[in-house]
């Protein structure tokens, strides 16, 4: 069973970091041969990254149609994405070959955000270890850290 943290907490992370949002959209569900390989590729990549702390991958949250990833730097993210010996690059080239001219069958997207040290805030209450707090360190949201403004000013 997941442990719920009943008190208010926030995340604490040293230095800059990257938030990477990635997802897919099945536009033609009757064509699983187009979208199923895309769907199946991500869990393998996550397992691979979790086994390699030196990759710079800090953690992730999964939701339907969306995966939020936390990275130490953009350079770490890019190095993983372009490494032909890791799972992403072969999956990406296979995706492009498989789709060919039928790009509308399945959609993929991503957004990358560089976050400067101290330029973030978050709070969790009545939650399991989650989000940035799960990918970094969790601290009590007390004193200056009780409000969003206080958390941002504390950075």
Where are these regions (language model features)?
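Tryptophan-centric aromatic hotspots in well-structured domains and transmembrane helices
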Residues: 70-72
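Short S/T/G/P-rich N-terminal loop/turn motif that feeds into the first structured element of a domain
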Residues: 1-63, 79, 103-155
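An amphipathic, aromatic/His-enriched active-site/gating alpha helix that lines ligand/cofactor pockets
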Residues: 74-107
């Amino acid at each position: 069973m997941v442990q719920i943290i009943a008190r208010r907490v926030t995340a604490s992370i040293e230095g800059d970091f990257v938030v990477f949002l990635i997802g897919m959209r099945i536009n033609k569900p009757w064509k699983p041969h187009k979208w199923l390989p895309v769907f199946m590729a991500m869990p393998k990549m996550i397992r691979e990254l979790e086994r390699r702390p030196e990759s710079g991958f800090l953690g992730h949250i999964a939701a339907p149609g969306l995966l939020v990833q936390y990275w130490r730097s953009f350079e770490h993210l890019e190095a993983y994405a372009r490494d032909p010996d890791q799972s992403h690059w072969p999956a990406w080239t296979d995706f492009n070959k498989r789709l060919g001219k039928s790009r509308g069958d399945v959609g993929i997207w991503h957004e990358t955000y560089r976050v400067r040290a101290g330029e973030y805030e978050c709070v969790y209450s009545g939650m399991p270890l989650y989000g940035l707090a799960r990918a970094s360190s969790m601290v009590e949201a007390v004193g200056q850290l009780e409000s969003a403004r206080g958390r941002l000013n504390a950075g």
